[in-house]
Amino acid sequence: GENIDRSRIRYAIDLAKEGNADLILELIDDVVAFTNKGRKIKCRTLGQKKYISALKRNTVVFGVGPAGTGKTYLAVAMAVLAYKNKEVEKIILTRPAVEAGEKLGFLPGDLQNKVDPYLRPLYDALYDFLGSENFHALSERGVIEVAPLAYMRGRTLNDAYIILDEAQNCTVEQMKMFLTRFGEGSRVV
C-alpha cells in the first residue's frame, strides 16, 4: 500500500482522458531513487519521466519547467545515484549568486554567509539523499562541492556530475563560461 495524494489522482484522470491510461502504472511503479531515510522517489508526471530518461541517456541536459516541478531535486537524485554507482567521482552544484538584481555586497557577513542562502535549496536536496553526516563527510573530502557559479571560472571538471541551478538567472557570458567547464566523463544539467 502506498498513499496517493489528490494531485496524483487528478493527473491520472487527465492521462486517462487523453487516452494515456496505460502510462499511469508506469508512473506509479517506476522508482527513480531512495532518500537517505528510504522514501521512494517516483516521477509524478510524464514530464518528470522524460526528464529522468534524458538525465540517464545524455551528458548535457537542459531542464525547463515552472518552479516547483522537481528539476533540481531530481537532478540531485540522479547525481547522487551516479556517484554511488561510481559513474562519477564528484558532484558539483552551482548557481548564480545574484538573483533579481540583488548585490552580494549589501548582505552582512563574509562571502560564505552571503552565498549560503542562495545555495540552500541545493543543500536541502543533498541532505535528503545523503543525510547530514554523510553530506558533510563527502564535502570535507571534496567529493561534493556547492559553490557560486563565479567559482567555476578557469576550471576543467572531469568525472563530475555538475548541476547548474537557476540557470535562467545567468548572463550569456556566465552560461558560456559554465558550458566550457566540463571535461572528460562529466555530465551537466
Predicted regions span which residues?
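Interdomain "pre-motor" coupling segment immediately N-terminal to P-loop NTPase/helicase cores
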Residues: G1-I28
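Pre-Walker A adenine-sensing motif
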Residues: I41-R57
